[in-house]
Amino acid sequence: MSKYIAITFSPVQSFIEKSRKLRDLYGASQILSDLTSTIVTHRPEQYHLISPGLLNSQQGMPNRVLLKIDSEMQSSSSEEIIAELQRAFLNRWKNILATCRKWVENALAPYYRSSEWNWQKSWKKWEKRTWEFFWGMGDNLESAMVDLENRKLARNWQGVNWVGESSSLSGTDAIAWYGMDRENQDMKTLDWSEENRHIALFYRRLAFLLDGVNDPDGQPKDRQPEGKYIDGNERLNIPELTKRLITLPHIARSLGVELPEELRQRGFRDLIRRPQDNPASVGQKTGWFMGDGDKVGDYLKDLGSDQKIRDFSKIMRQWGQKFQRDFNQTELGRIIYAGGDDFLGIVYNSQFPGPQLNSIDLDRVLHWLQTPHK
């Protein structure tokens, strides 16, 4: 007898809401799409993939997967196949983390002895505690999706504890730096000013290297990094640092991660958002828009046949690609993610900075978004 399986996953830490740069947003989207791609391309001979469609493109891969396992395909039990897919998912995330960590260690090797790197333990914790993986199973698609939703109610997650200062972006989780796992430290006697000095130097060096400056310590003290990837005054936790680094072409290539076409052609034009708590700071006002399919789950159930669902998934992904490409050509902003039944975009002034160019042309944005796009 055939079994239907529904799979999804979600970040425990929000990958989107605290982002100040386009690089954060693109990095988060790339990671989500890549992890879904890992699930649906692992041992495909064990199941029939129903959704998502359009596997030749990694961009905009939704994090909801529908599978069908026929009885003649079941050399392993359905539960064993699910466990194997989950292991592949987690191993891919471990590989992403390890690649980013090793790149930083190699880049900063001239400045720190190997014995000074005390941060591997924290990276190991984030291997297991970043994502929640959910699945449901049933004799038909509807029962599998209901089972998935029921299982999502029983969450089993543990946070990562930390001491010291936290991320300057989210305000949560430890700052990633080479000494974050130092042992035998007394919190009462620790010289916090000295630690902050080490952290500041670590991020200054890393920011300059990511900007392409080969001699960070040779730069004048009053010179600040350009901040293509990291601003010199930013302090990131491990997931946030990973989001930035996965957009580095060398790391993306080594992982086989597909960067969006417009970024390969035009590069990043990073957008600095003005923090809400400091309206006088550098940056510009931005607007956000998002869309979510109205009762798409119910629509999928009504479609009935597996082939109709496959066709619908493919059409939705094709629509998302065209929607993203068309909006990005308007120079009103960027579509960060468009796949499946949802999308996220940002609007801003593409001419910023400039005299009297701080406003967003909301009339044009609304007119474009309200125009039907097929």
Regions found by a protein language model. Give the residues of each.
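Regulatory and interdomain segments flanking nucleotide-handling catalytic cores
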Residues: 1-374
